């Protein structure tokens, strides 16, 4: 699988591909990227193409982006979304958007960037959906997995955790404490392995 761009809700390669003002240029850049992937492939081998935006919990922006993208007849196989609850809405918002994307676009959906803090970081001035503790981090990932696994038509394709191995340095979203000890969140991967 190849992702064309990263979180491209605002376009890419500004100013030429900046959105919303340059949709024609953006579409040309997307087609060029996809064609470049295919041109670099061995005969009869074509990796899946993913388009990734950062609106996991925002159905309206997701709809606007993909509806507009599809008017350009852009061919892709997977929808990628980022989902950080302090930026992208509640788990209910994520669930509603996953259901919408599955029914509307009928493509597998990956959460390509997901994370939650194991110590207080993001929710200093507002209530957190889960405690920002190692156990709260684990509970958050379990809940996100449930949303993905319950996406209609089995189109919830998986989750990628953002930066799990920074070991308590610049991030509290990783899977290890400052001494390198693994946090409880790691057990979620055993619990939710698809067979």
State where each predicted segment sits:
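Substrate-binding cleft of secreted/luminal carbohydrate-active enzymes
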Residues: 86, 108-120, 126-195
């Amino acid at each position: 699988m190849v992702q064309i761009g990263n979180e491209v809700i605002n376009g890419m390669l500004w100013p030429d591909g900046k959105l919303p003002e340059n949709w024609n240029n953006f579409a040309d850049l997307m087609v060029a990227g996809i064609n470049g992937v295919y041109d670099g492939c061995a005969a009869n081998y074509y990796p899946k193409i993913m388009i990734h935006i950062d609106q996991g919990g925002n159905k309206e922006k997701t709809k606007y982006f993909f509806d507009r993208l599809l008017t350009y007849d852009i061919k892709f196989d997977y929808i990628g979304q980022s989902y950080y609850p302090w930026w992208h809405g509640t788990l209910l918002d994520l669930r509603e958007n996953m259901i919408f994307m599955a029914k509307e676009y009928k493509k597998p959906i990956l959460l390509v960037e997901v994370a939650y803090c194991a110590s207080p970081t993001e929710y200093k001035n507002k209530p957190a959906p889960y405690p920002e503790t190692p156990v709260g981090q684990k509970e958050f990932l379990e809940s996100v997995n449930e949303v993905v696994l319950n996406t209609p038509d089995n189109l919830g394709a998986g989750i990628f955790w953002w930066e799990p191995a920074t070991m308590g340095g610049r991030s509290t979203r990783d899977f290890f404490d400052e001494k390198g000890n693994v946090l409880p969140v790691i057990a979620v991967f055993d619990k939710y392995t698809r067979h």
